[in-house]
């Protein structure tokens, strides 16, 4: 039997092949580095999602700049804070107009409840997430925090700042169009109960002949600029309930809500 392995010759490598006479050896091509997405490309993508092309792109850039990204306190006016202030009021005006036209039979109390629900921070955070606005946020070392974690509150602020930027760039009509695109479906949803859960729990306890609920801080975690609180609420004869929040007040509300749900408080 013929040894087939004798006919198999090794494939020459680049080191085995001599360069033709009179030519320099060809150096291997350098490895390509993965290109980072430029700020300009990110802003262009965000413009598309917003549905507004900025004549002054610096307004959009400022709307995404957290104060921690600035080198000195003198540059605070270059952060999104002023635009957030403006956008907050523009949002309130546009949503008020939308509610007035959408619910002609609603009284002032119902309109106020619906307005409060639609302009609250959590709603702005939801809108920001739906538009992937976190992609454009500019944070400094302090703002980024441990693990470059983006605080939820920053997203809500930026959403309002974007509204302010659109208003300055395109006027009321442009800002109103943006708000209507992103708030219309939310406006059509049933309004949530807006009463403070701590008040609801206290009134329920009093009706049962119980003392005022006691709130106790159980734990505080996280860095100084982004703390997380765990609070327990206690009532005699009932199992305590706990809540977590970015402030003691928020954690207390969460704890009260947990007890309200568990006890079936209406």
From Swiss-Prot:
Its EC number is 3.1.26.3. GO terms for molecular function: double-stranded RNA binding; metal ion binding; ribonuclease III activity; rRNA binding. It catalyses: Endonucleolytic cleavage to 5'-phosphomonoester. Residues 43-171 form the RNase III domain. The active site is at 88, 160. GO terms for biological process: mRNA processing; regulation of gene expression; rRNA processing; tRNA processing. It is an enzyme of class 3 (hydrolase). InterPro entries: dsRBD_dom, RNase_III, RNase_III_dom, RNase_III_sf. Its main location: cytoplasm. Residues 1-35 are annotated as: Disordered. SMART domains: DSRM, RIBOc. GO terms for cellular component: cytoplasm. CDD domains: DSRM_RNAse_III_family, RIBOc. Its cofactor is Mg(2+). Mg(2+) binds at residues 84, 157, 160. Coiled coil: none annotated. Residues 196-265 form the DRBM domain. Pfam families: dsrm, Ribonucleas_3_3. Homodimer. This is Ribonuclease 3. The gene is rnc.
């Amino acid at each position: 039997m013929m040894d087939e392995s004798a006919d198999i010759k090794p494939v020459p490598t680049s080191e085995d092949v001599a360069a033709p006479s009179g030519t320099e050896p060809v150096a291997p091509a350098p490895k390509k580095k993965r290109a980072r997405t430029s700020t300009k490309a990110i802003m262009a993508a965000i413009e598309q999602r917003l549905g507004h092309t900025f004549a002054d792109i610096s307004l959009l850039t400022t709307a995404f700049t957290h104060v921690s990204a600035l080198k000195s306190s003198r540059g605070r006016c270059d952060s999104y804070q002023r635009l957030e202030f403006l956008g907050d009021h523009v949002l309130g005006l546009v949503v008020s107009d939308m509610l007035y036209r959408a619910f002609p039979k609603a009284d002032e109390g119902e309109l106020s409840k619906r307005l409060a629900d639609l302009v609250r921070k959590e709603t702005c955070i939801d809108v920001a997430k739906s538009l992937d606005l976190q992609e454009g946020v500019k944070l400094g070392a302090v703002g980024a925090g441990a693990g470059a974690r983006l605080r939820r509150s920053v997203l809500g602020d930026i959403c309002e700042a974007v509204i302010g930027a659109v208003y300055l760039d395109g006027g009321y009509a442009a800002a109103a169009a943006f708000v209507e695109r992103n708030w219309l479906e939310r406006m059509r949803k049933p309004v949530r109960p807006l009463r403070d859960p701590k008040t609801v729990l206290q009134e329920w306890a009093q009706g049962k002949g119980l003392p005022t609920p006691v709130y106790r801080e159980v734990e505080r975690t996280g860095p100084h600029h982004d703390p997380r609180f765990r609070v327990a609420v206690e009532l005699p004869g009932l199992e305590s309930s706990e809540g977590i929040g970015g402030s003691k007040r928020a954690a207390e509300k969460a704890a009260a809500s947990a007890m309200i749900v568990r006890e079936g408080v209406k």
